[in-house]
């Protein structure tokens, strides 16, 4: 733990690829991006298509060359109607782009640029830039993207109309965009390695539209990849995602990933989720990349049922995945089905009956580590964020560290990756 807790921030800039004219804007560059991103192997396809019928379309049309835009403005978007939660995700497009095009790529759970920690990136051929927009209030509600630019990278001067590969990469809390000329192989890239959601979390389906330009761009193919057969995936809602954590390196799943560098670890979580949302992840995610172990923390948004847990266990069994169901943190709620006492009593009863283990996040975050799930179990308020209300709901950095410390105590086989 000491190695993690002593991580320092700095303002170094790094050029991780020798053939790239991109720039890394970073305050955590002590973490090797080359090792974590560019040498990543063992991916699996979540989606691959060249056909208009696989997208939600407004005015784009199918041509011999591919899927072509027919107008400008966000009303003329094309949408990949798939909602991926996995935090290692590689979206790759082959495009034909006009010399005057400004293309927008927005991940949104509601309207374009709005929702749960959305993101918005762009290719601006006329001004020879690729860039990322800022997310408003990344340590608070983080519900929409601003018009302010977070960062830009210059294209090589000889980039003109033609075919390009555009990659959008999410790796943990990092966002990377890279534009590569199909013929010359020259590229430019931009990396956000901030430890808060400065440019969003790429949450929600991908929307693409032409903001400016007379030459209509063409999508020749679109692919989405993720890590195949990870050793562990941490699954849940905003608490697992790291909502309101002032340094995302201290999320429980992130601490585990840093402490286990030789293992494949993912986080698949989204603010506002319930058990129903987790069950829906199997069709588009878990059944495809088949994690070996799944650590679930769910219930703060209500919706837990023993039947839902039965379905979760069955779906995990079907793909050969070991399930761990953790107790909820000791948060405050006025809604009966969301109170940690109600949620944790249900989890305990079901887990004992089904021989399922889970970490005691309730003990970790309770005042005086009181292990009784009743009204006397009050939260340790020093372990919760004050950026949103209710205050005692989202663990802060200190709270996530205390939660992480429960893993070797309650789940030693999982934490030490013991083969049983």
Task: Tell me what each language-model feature is.
Residues 211-271, 276, 281-290:
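Serine-esterase "nucleophile elbow" of acetyl-processing enzymes
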């Amino acid at each position: 733990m000491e190695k993690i807790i002593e991580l320092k921030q700095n303002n170094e800039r790094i050029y991780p690829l020798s053939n790239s004219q991109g720039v890394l804007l970073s305050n955590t560059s002590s973490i090797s991006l080359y090792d974590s991103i560019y040498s990543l192997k063992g991916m699996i396809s979540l989606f691959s298509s060249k056909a208009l019928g696989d997208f939600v379309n407004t005015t784009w049309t199918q041509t011999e060359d591919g899927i072509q835009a027919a107008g400008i403005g966000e009303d003329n978007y094309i949408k990949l109607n798939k909602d991926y939660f996995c935090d290692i995700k590689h979206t790759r497009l082959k495009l034909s782009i006009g010399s005057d095009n400004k293309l927008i790529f927005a991940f949104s759970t509601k309207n374009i640029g709005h929702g749960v920690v959305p993101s918005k990136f762009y290719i601006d051929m006329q001004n020879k830039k690729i860039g990322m927009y800022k997310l408003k209030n990344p340590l608070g509600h983080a519900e929409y993207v601003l018009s302010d630019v977070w960062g830009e990278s210059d294209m090589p001067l000889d980039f003109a109309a033609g075919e390009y590969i555009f990659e959008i990469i999410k790796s943990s809390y990092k966002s990377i965009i890279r534009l590569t000329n199909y013929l010359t192989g020259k590229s430019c890239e931009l990396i956000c390695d901030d430890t808060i959601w400065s440019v969003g979390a790429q949450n929600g389906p991908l929307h693409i539209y032409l903001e400016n330009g007379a030459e209509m761009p063409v999508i020749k193919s679109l692919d989405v990849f993720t890590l195949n057969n990870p050793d562990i995936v941490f699954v849940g809602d905003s608490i697992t995602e790291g909502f309101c954590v002032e340094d995302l390196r201290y999320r429980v799943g992130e601490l585990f990933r840093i402490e286990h560098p030789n293992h494949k670890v993912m986080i698949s979580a989204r603010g506002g989720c319930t058990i129903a949302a987790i069950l829906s992840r199997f069709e588009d995610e878990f059944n495809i990349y088949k994690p070996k172990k799944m650590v679930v923390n769910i219930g703060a948004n209500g919706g837990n049922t023993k039947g839902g847990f039965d379905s979760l266990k069955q779906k995990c069994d079907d793909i050969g995945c070991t399930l761990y169901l953790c107790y909820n943190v000791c948060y405050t709620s006025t809604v009966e089905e969301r109170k940690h006492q109600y949620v944790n009593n249900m989890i305990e009863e079901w887990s004992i009956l089904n021989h399922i283990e889970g970490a005691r996040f309730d003990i970790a975050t309770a005042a005086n580590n009181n292990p009784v799930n009743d009204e006397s179990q009050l939260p340790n308020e020093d372990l919760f964020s004050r950026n949103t209300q209710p205050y005692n709901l989202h663990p802060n950095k200190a709270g996530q560290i205390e939660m992480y410390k429960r893993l070797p105590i309650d789940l030693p086989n999982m934490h030490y990756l013991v083969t049983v």
